């Protein structure tokens, strides 16, 4: 049976996709069949006359098994905005059971050892009709991996995100630090503070890298606590 983990971030552009690629590569290095799923993606570009989300394409490319675009994502919207706004503009209602059906089909069709489910935005991103994406994560009872985007304010964002996950009675099974800029004042002090405040395994640091999707990212994360 597939192990499933939800990857959330401390904010939009914290580096969820970069971290998910690293997780996929780290799992592959251990001989595991790992694939990715993104329940909701907002922001598409025309590629070969088809609207596609770049994050979904990267997850599709780096999954250990061949997947169709539609297997990786349940809802893909054109607008670069919060999912609930993108859905409303498209005249679509995001349904939790559709998210679950997509995940279930992926499990059955691939027989993957691990599925990394990448969220959208932060933990409390709304998806419409009074629901948050975190409501679905809670319904699926998924363990959570948190990506901390290294920027001023990340300590507050990280602690608040952890508290929200804990409030939802879900386990934070690991977290990583992702450097989203070449330099950050007091980076090491921020990292050490987070290590002392977050009661979850520290999985590693992903350095600032140009074109991270073309690099070996798996070496930066220790996934032993997930296995």
Swiss-Prot record:
> Biological process (GO) annotations?
biotin biosynthetic process
Pathway in which this enzyme or protein is active: Cofactor biosynthesis; biotin biosynthesis; biotin from 7,8-diaminononanoate: step 1/2
Q: Which residues bind ATP?
A: 13-18, 55, 118-121, 178-179, 207-209, 214
Keywords (A to Z) from UniProt: ATP-binding, Biotin biosynthesis, Cytoplasm, Ligase, Magnesium, Metal-binding, Nucleotide-binding
> What role does this protein play?
Catalyzes a mechanistically unusual reaction, the ATP-dependent insertion of CO2 between the N7 and N8 nitrogen atoms of 7,8-diaminopelargonic acid (DAPA, also called 7,8-diammoniononanoate) to form a ureido ring.
What name does this protein carry?
ATP-dependent dethiobiotin synthetase BioD
Stated family: Belongs to the dethiobiotin synthetase family.
SUPFAM superfamilies the UniProt entry points to: P-loop containing nucleoside triphosphate hydrolases
Give the source species. Answer: Tolumonas auensis (strain DSM 9187 / NBRC 110442 / TA 4)
Q: Which cofactor does it need?
A: Mg(2+)
Q: Which GO terms describe its molecular function?
A: ATP binding; dethiobiotin synthase activity; magnesium ion binding
Q: For Mg(2+), which residues are the binding ones?
A: 17, 55, 118
Q: What is the protein's quaternary organization?
A: Homodimer.
What GO cellular component entries does it have? cytosol
């Amino acid at each position: 049976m597939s192990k499933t983990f939800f990857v959330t971030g401390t904010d939009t552009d914290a580096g969820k996709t970069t971290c998910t690629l690293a997780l996929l590569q780290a799992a592959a290095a251990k001989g595991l069949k790992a694939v990715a799923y993104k329940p909701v993606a907002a922001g598409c570009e025309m590629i070969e006359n088809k609207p596609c989300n770049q994050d979904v394409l990267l997850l599709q490319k780096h999954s250990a098994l061949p997947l169709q675009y539609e297997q990786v994502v349940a809802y893909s919207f054109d607008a670069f905005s919060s999912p609930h706004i993108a859905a409303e503009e498209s005249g679509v209602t995001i349904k939790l059971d559709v998210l679950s059906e997509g995940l279930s089909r992926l499990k059955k069709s691939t027989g993957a050892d691990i599925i990394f489910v990448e969220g959208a935005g932060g933990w409390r991103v709304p998806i419409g009709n009074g629901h948050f994406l975190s409501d679905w994560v809670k319904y699926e009872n998924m363990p959570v991996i948190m990506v901390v985007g290294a920027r001023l304010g990340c300590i507050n964002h990280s602690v608040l995100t952890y508290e929200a996950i804990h409030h939802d009675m879900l386990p934070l099974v690991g977290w990583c630090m992702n450097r989203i800029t070449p330099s950050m004042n007091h980076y090491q002090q921020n990292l050490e503070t987070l290590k002392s405040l977050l009661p979850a395994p520290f999985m590693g640091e992903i350095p600032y890298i140009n074109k991270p999707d073309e690099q070996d990212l798996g070496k930066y994360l220790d996934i032993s606590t997930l296995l």
